[in-house]
Amino acid sequence: MAWAPLLLTLLSLLTGSLSQPVLTQPPSASASLGASVTLTCTLSSGYSNYKVDWYQQRPGKGPRFVMRVGTGGIVGSKGDGIPDRFSVLGSGLNRYLTIKNIQEEDESDYHCGADHGSGSNFV
């Protein structure tokens, strides 16, 4: 029976490494030109320390990295060409992307994704 504690330890380590965060994002948001909008990406319970990447995807184009956000705000730097009107904030399980003074070129789909070491989840 000496193997039982070892087996339980291995199972708990494997279970922890295979678990993945689930991300949820409201289906849509809209705002007028010149206004501001805040988009929310929510991590599943137990993943409050995870960082989330925000991406912008214009019709017919591939995703473009906007910036990474953790509980302390931006992590690293913004993606190439992302204006200062874009900002992020992290609080608890929520990761926010705010766009101020919305311009026509901001009209896009915005997705969030979390890298959990064994792959990535996107919504």
UniProtKB/Swiss-Prot annotation:
Q: Where is this region: Framework-1?
A: 20-44
Q: Where is this region: Complementarity-determining-3?
A: 113-123
Classification via Pfam families:
V-set
Q: Where in the cell is it found?
A: Secreted; Cell membrane
* Superkingdom to which the source organism belongs: Eukaryota
**Subunit relationships:** Immunoglobulins are composed of two identical heavy chains and two identical light chains; disulfide-linked.
Specify the protein name: Immunoglobulin lambda variable 9-49
What organism does the record attribute this protein to? Homo sapiens (Human)
Gene that produces this protein: IGLV9-49
